[in-house]
Amino acid sequence: MVSKTWICGFISIITVVQALSCEKHDVLKKYQVGKFSSLTSTERDTPPSTTIEKWWINVCEEHNVEPPEECKKNDMLCGLTDVILPGKDAITTQIIDFDKNIGFNVEETESALTLTLKGATWGANSFDAKLEFQCNDNMKQDELTSHTWADKSIQLTLKGPSGCLKSKDDDKKNGDGDNGKDGDSEGKKPAKKAGGTSWFTWLFLYALLFTLIYLMVVSFLNTRGGSFQDFRAEFIQRSTQFLTSLPEFCKEVVSRILGRSTAQRGGYSAV
């Protein structure tokens, strides 16, 4: 029984560690969260002291940077609380760590990427943390916009590039190199053909529309003051004449373009 429990625990730890690799996670790999870390702080007056709260965030193990001195090296979230009394050095009164071996859950919505960290031990208590990354690709670093620490839950909202989807250029860098480019080139050729076909189709539709309008206007002018039946008969007659004369008209246009019209040939005599 003990061996089964140990094996299950070992497997669960391996699963969690692997899931923290953002490039291997189905959702996290789509976002820029693996490129950035942040150290934010807020200051508030707590007379006679000043309290400073700092939050160190480095979600993905691919982004290897050193955390603050008081935090652990494998922390993905670390909270520090410093208290400063007048004329004295700052004293760190609280440190809470969420390392990369704890469980977590990822959720993506239209407005944010949310990462929930579960079960960090702080003294005799267990805490969860909810990190909400809102996209702003005009910012170079993430900024903490709000934070709450109530009961046994911590909520942090950050705005910046981490919550933004990766660009196509980033996806190409993670692709197959030249093979991916060849595939793209082959994929673009049918698009060009489709564009040419679309242009010809629109030209034909415009010509048909203008012809229809022309026949309707001429029929209306010739039957002005008459009944709808007169207009209908005139329109059908002119449409029929147009359709029957269309092949001869096209033949005449082609002949003139190629310089082989009967009028041109009639202007010369054999020597």
Curated annotation (Swiss-Prot):
PROSITE patterns reported in the protein's UniProt record: MRH
Coiled coil: none
Residue spans crossing the bilayer: 200-220
Compartments reported by the entry: Cytoplasmic vesicle membrane; Golgi apparatus membrane; Mitochondrion membrane; Preautophagosomal structure membrane
Lumenal topological domain: 20-199
A GO cellular component entry from the record: phagophore assembly site membrane
Subunit and interaction comment: Forms a complex with ATG9 and ATG23.
Name this protein carries in UniProt: Autophagy-related protein 27
Organism of derivation: Saccharomyces cerevisiae (strain ATCC 204508 / S288c) (Baker's yeast)
Upper classification of the organism: Eukaryota, Fungi, Dikarya, Ascomycota, Saccharomycotina
